[in-house]
């Protein structure tokens, strides 16, 4: 981990971008750059004032190319199309990336994997330490219950979220499926309507709720005969996501070029369940 990584925040004017700026400052690291779309009216504004923490002397830039030389790592919580361009630029420049964007196409996922051969990339659907502890608990529960229970995942988010199910819900499903030796693409059931017939034991169901200002809630249900185990994570604000992403940014600087996730950042791969 770099002692004082130079961190760039992409999508700095967005809700998550502003919180990331706060998190970088709270962690005592250097905010080297804050980037927005070239046409944004925020270009030229002070990043600290935008984030509500006062003047810090870092201006919002409209060009990632111009500021990459000042960064050891960038944090990207933007949109798939934007991240696609950022991957190409950071790969060519050899600048590490921490990516929290969700909703990628298969082609965009392939580009991410290719970029990780050029520069280190941390990619996770959720950077909350609590969520990643939850994933570890799901792996343990899956090992214990095996195929003896029905598994359902319920997720809830604010009304503005555009992808469903959430990346975190899919991450939970993938962790469960992998532990059970299943293929989530084959076993996932994303909606039920009409006469569906009896539930197939191998299926992993997903239910989505959208409304209000829910930051993020995820519950995995292991449903047996006569008992049910529920493992739940609830986020009450976004700082936990931002703090985890900043932790990942500090960790990834200087690592070899490959794709990492929060299991690597938190050392979970060394913990057996």
Swiss-Prot record:
Domain of life: Bacteria
GO CC terms: cytosol
Amino acids binding NADP(+): 37
Gene Ontology biological process terms, A to Z: diaminopimelate biosynthetic process; lysine biosynthetic process via diaminopimelate
Binding-site list for (S)-2,3,4,5-tetrahydrodipicolinate: 158, 167-168
Record InterPro entries: DapB_C, DapB_N, DapB_N_CS, DHDPR_bac, NAD(P)-bd_dom_sf
Annotated metabolic or biological route of this protein: Amino-acid biosynthesis; L-lysine biosynthesis via DAP pathway; (S)-tetrahydrodipicolinate from L-aspartate: step 4/4
Transcription is among the record's keywords: no
EC code(s) of this entry: 1.17.1.8
Reaction equation(s) it catalyzes: (S)-2,3,4,5-tetrahydrodipicolinate + NAD(+) + H2O = (2S,4S)-4-hydroxy-2,3,4,5-tetrahydrodipicolinate + NADH + H(+); (S)-2,3,4,5-tetrahydrodipicolinate + NADP(+) + H2O = (2S,4S)-4-hydroxy-2,3,4,5-tetrahydrodipicolinate + NADPH + H(+)
Residues of the signal peptide: none
Catalytic site positions: 157 (proton donor/acceptor), 161 (proton donor)
Binding site for NAD(+): 11-16, 36, 100-102, 124-127
A Pfam family that the UniProt record links to this protein: DapB_N
Record key words, sorted: Amino-acid biosynthesis, Cytoplasm, Diaminopimelate biosynthesis, Lysine biosynthesis, NAD, NADP, Oxidoreductase
Keyword Magnesium: no
MF annotations from Gene Ontology: 4-hydroxy-tetrahydrodipicolinate reductase; NAD binding; NADP binding; oxidoreductase activity, acting on CH or CH2 groups, NAD or NADP as acceptor
Main location: cytoplasm
Subcellular location: Cytoplasm
Annotated disulfide bonds: none
Family to which the UniProt record says this protein belongs: Belongs to the DapB family.
Function: Catalyzes the conversion of 4-hydroxy-tetrahydrodipicolinate (HTPA) to tetrahydrodipicolinate.
Protein name (database record): 4-hydroxy-tetrahydrodipicolinate reductase
């Amino acid at each position: 981990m770099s002692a004082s990584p130079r961190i760039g925040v992409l999508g700095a004017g967005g809700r998550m971008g502003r919180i990331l700026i706060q998190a970088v400052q709270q962690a005592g690291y250097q905010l080297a750059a804050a980037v927005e779309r070239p046409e944004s009216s925020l270009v030229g504004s002070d990043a600290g004032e935008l984030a509500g923490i006062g003047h810090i002397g870092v201006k919002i830039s409209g060009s990632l190319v111009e500021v990459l030389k000042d960064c050891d790592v960038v944090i990207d919580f933007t949109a798939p199309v934007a991240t696609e361009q950022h991957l190409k630029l950071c790969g060519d420049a050899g600048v590490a990336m921490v990516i929290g964007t969700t909703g990628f196409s298969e082609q965009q996922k392939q580009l991410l994997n290719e970029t990780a051969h050029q520069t280190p990339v941390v990619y996770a659907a959720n950077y909350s330490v609590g969520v990643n502890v939850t994933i570890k608990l799901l792996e343990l529960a899956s090992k214990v219950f095996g195929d003896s229970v029905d598994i359902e995942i319920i997720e809830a988010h604010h009304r503005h979220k555009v992808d469903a199910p959430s990346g975190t819900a899919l991450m939970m499903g993938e962790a469960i499926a992998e532990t059970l030796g299943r293929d989530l693409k084959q076993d996932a059931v994303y909606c039920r309507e009409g006469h569906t017939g009896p539930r197939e034991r191998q299926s992993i169901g997903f239910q989505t709720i959208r409304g209000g200002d829910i930051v993020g809630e995820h519950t995995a249900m292991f449903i047996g005969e006569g008992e049910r185990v529920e493992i739940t994570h609830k986020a009450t604000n976004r700082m936990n996501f931002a703090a985890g992403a900043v932790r990942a940014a500090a960790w990834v600087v200087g690592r070899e070029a490959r794709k990492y996730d929060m299991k690597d950042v938190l050392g979970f791969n060394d913990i057996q369940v």
